[in-house]
Amino acid sequence: MKAATAPLFNAIADGPPKAHGYWLTTKDNLRIRVGHWRSDAAHGTIFLCPGRTEYIEKYGKSARRLVENGFDVLAIDWRGQGLSERLHKDTLLGHVSEFSKYQIDLDTVMDWAESAKLPGPWFILGHSMGGCISLRALHKHERFLAAAFTGPMWGINVVTLTRSAAWLIAKTGTLMGLGTLYTPSTKAESYCATADFEGNTLTNDRAMWEYMRQQLIEHPELQLGGPSLRWFHRALRETRQLARLPSPKQPCLCFLGSNEQVVDVERIKNRMAAWANGELVIIEPGEHEVLMEAPKVYNSILDRICTHFDTHQSKTMLSRDDAESKGENRQT
């Protein structure tokens, strides 16, 4: 699969030194960006799926820790955000026509990773909206050996509206052709670039807040504002559909901040209670972005994720060796 060189601002990312950005073209002819941080002795690849408004560079520090643990890392700019192709003339509008389009983005990155012969096995790590996309992907693909999530968007915390009212506004606005209007209470500005640290819903750590804020100030082309009504409606619909599905068979480790205010906490708890080989870990104290808390916190989370992936890689290898041994015994 063809790929062209794309910018990756590793100076603001503070990521591992072996960093490369690539442009990929999806099957519906959109240009998206992928970032690849390479380990010298990788024993697997982690597909890092960011949330809404996010971009590759935001996960530089996370990638550094994952690479130190022996993994290659692929981070994705979803269509409509980061440096990937924007979908509306108002480039600050967070918009998508259907959530299934994000699966096209992920499929494109997987195809490229296959053609580039990135090391297996493959794992998936999804945050917020990326957690929603990743959960859908686990139902579609056998390729991912295990999964991890942080603050996954398996439901949206509708603060100022009841859920039924939120559905009504989102659906009616979309049907009336108003799908590209901003969702009520949101606007055409980046939250992290404009909000104050005090009272923010993302992190308790001021240094990490400034890390994110400075990235957006130095590269304003990475900024994204509020979601469109259509995005909001499609997000409500996708999370409802996912909630009705059984849990995937892959092992899962999920982290949730104790003061989560962005996504639906009950949806996460219900999902993890029904995930046979899943574990939910509450980070105390923690906001929505637990990987953007203090270094001691996020490094501990990332180390635990790597142990989770390594453990299930080892179990798979042992099972495979045992199956091969039994097959040889049958032949003798």
Feature locations, PLM:
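Catalytic active-site module of serine/aspartate enzymes centered on a nucleophile-bearing elbow/loop
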Residues: 279, 283-332
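Short alpha-helix in the alpha/beta-hydrolase fold that links the catalytic acid
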Residues: 250, 264-273
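An N-terminal hydrophobic leader/cap segment in hydrolases
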Residues: 1-25, 30-37
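Short beta-strand/loop motif that positions the catalytic acidic residue
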Residues: 248, 254-256
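Alpha/beta-hydrolase-fold enzymes
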Residues: 129, 133-219
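Alpha/beta-hydrolase active-site loop
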Residues: 94-114
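Acidic catalytic loop of the alpha/beta-hydrolase fold
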Residues: 259-263
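Conserved alpha/beta-hydrolase
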Residues: 56, 63-89
